[in-house]
Amino acid sequence: MVIDHPIFLESIRFIRSHLIANDLNYLEKKVLERLVHTSGDFSVQNLLNFSEGACEKGLQALKNGAPILTDTDMAAAAIKTMAENTTRNKVFTAGMWFGKNNHTNLTKTAYGLSEGWKELSAINSGSKSPIVVIGSSPTALTYLIDILENAKDLPSLIIGMPVGFIGVENSKNKLISTDLPRIVLNSTRGGAAMAAAAVNALLRETI
C-alpha cells in the first residue's frame, strides 16, 4: 500500500497544471509527472521518448511478477521500497554478477547486466520477462542491445536513461532505433533517480 504525503500530492497537482505534453497517453503522462517531480525541471517533457505500448507492456509485466534488473545499487534501492509496497517484484542489480567477469574487454557493469539478463530471462520469459533499468552506464545499455539483436526472449521494457557525456546519446539513439519496448530520456541527462522514477510511476499503477 502506498500512502502519499500531502506535499507530494500538491506537487503532482502543480506539475499537471503546467504540463503541455498533450500527445501522451495516461501511463506516459504518469511517467512524465514522476520524472518532472524527481528532477524539478519541466524541460523533461521535451526529452522523453516512448515506444508504442511500452508503458502498457511494462505495467502488465509488473503485474505478472516480472523481475527488475538495474545497472546500479542506487537505482535498485530507489525501486525496492515501491516494489515492496505494491506488487513485490524482485529487484536485482548488475553487481550481483560482477564476480563472474572473465571478459577483460567489458566493463563490470556491462558484463554484470548482460549476465543478469541471461540468467533472469531464462527463468522469466514471455509476459514475465525482466524489466531492465539503466540510469548510469551507456556501455551496459549498448552491450545489452547488441546481445538482444538475435535473442529469442526480449525484455518487457527497457528504461534507457544513462547519464553523462561519453557514449550516452549514442547508446540512447541505438535503443531508439530498435523495436525494443523502451522509455528513453534523450540528451545527456538521466541518472539512477530518474530511471527509478520511471519504474516507480508504473509500479504505482499496479494498485
PLM features: residue spans?
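N-terminal nucleotide/polyanion-binding subdomain common to many enzyme families
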Residues: 1-65
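Glycine- and other small-residue-rich loops at beta-strand/loop junctions that grip anionic moieties
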Residues: 4, 47, 105, 133-134, ...
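C-terminal functional extensions of proteins
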Residues: 156, 166-207
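Buried hydrophobic positions in well-ordered alpha/beta secondary-structure cores of metabolic enzymes
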Residues: 71, 159-160, 198
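Short active-site oxyanion
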Residues: 63-68, 129-131, 155-156
